[in-house]
Amino acid sequence: MAGNSIGQLFTVTTCGESHGAGLMAIVDGVPPGLALSEADLQIDLDRRKPGTSKYSTQRRESDEVEIISGVFEGKTTGTSIGLLIRNTNQKSKDYSEIKDTFRPGHADYTYSMKYGFRDYRGGGRSSARETAMRVAAGAIAKKYLQDRLGVQIRGHVTQIGNEYSNVAEPSKIDWDFVNSNPFFCADKEAVSRFESLIDNLRREGTSCGARLEVIASGVPVGLGEPVFDRLDADIAHAMMSINAVKGVEIGDGMAVAGQFGHSSRDEMTPDGFTANHAGGILGGISSGQDIRVSIALKPTSSITTAGKSINTQGESVDMLTKGRHDPCVGVRATPIAEAMLAIVLLDHYLRHRGQNADVEQPLASIT
């Protein structure tokens, strides 16, 4: 199975299934000398892990990460960092009744058709369980970017179902509040609406989609490799690799179709840019402004409302999903999106440093 790695200089390779023994990652390209401990990674893993509130899946995993290589006496050695998380709360019997049935909206059918064989327990490799290793690896990237460059990467949920957050401007976001509520939402009033919505979804046996934004502040000018490795192209690729993501926007995104040139261009003055419609990326290269990425996640298809599907013999069946599932997968997606943005940014920083370390910029950054 190909497609388990991302990055060129900072690379992350993951393996593991939802109901297997555990999850693993090999993180390569981390510069030596970075102070790093398991506690540094655990912070974001605890933000993502299941069973932390009644608004997400009730599968309870400690998601305790073990660093098994690449760190000595509290610092990275420059060699590959091995990470391990053991699964402890599998309930594979929840899936025994559907081993011969394809769940609609999931990867059961496509995995079976592609490989001729599949792990039906919780979706196997296609389960969002695998994103725990992305978060662990991304925490390494976030720490390097923060410690060495002062880059901050933070996300917040802007929409769940048909309810919206009314706080969008980064300067108005209380990040402590975002990380103190189960929805990673910046709008205190929206949190109560989200709570009611999730409660209703559970009663109705259905689910809903979500939208969230990730913001990277302090990114230096110059990251990105035109033309095929544009920074925004690689960010979009990374975000689309997250389970359930069906849309990615950078800056104003799809809204640019209704804009006009005189108002949508990010004009410049000696004191800085007057706007950030482009989301911090111009010509595939970071401009030094905040990089703003928005993603949309579809409703999970694992719901307690019966639906139609087929079995492995191609026969029509009525499908009812059992097990422990998120009524809205977007609730726990914020640290995953942060991790993927961090992975891309560190990879591009190392690539930029390798080729352009001696470049003398013609003027100081205006941001």
Curated annotation (Swiss-Prot):
Q: Please name the GO terms that the record assigns under molecular function.
A: chorismate synthase activity; FMN binding
**GO biological process terms held by the UniProt record:** amino acid biosynthetic process; aromatic amino acid family biosynthetic process; chorismate biosynthetic process
Transmembrane segment boundaries? none
What keywords are assigned to this protein? Amino-acid biosynthesis, Aromatic amino acid biosynthesis, FAD, Flavoprotein, FMN, Lyase, NADP
Q: Which GO terms describe its cellular component?
A: cytosol
Q: Which HAMAP family match?
A: Chorismate_synth (MF_00300)
Q: What is this protein called?
A: Chorismate synthase
The organism is Psychrobacter arcticus (strain DSM 17307 / VKM B-2377 / 273-4)
Q: Which gene encodes it?
A: aroC
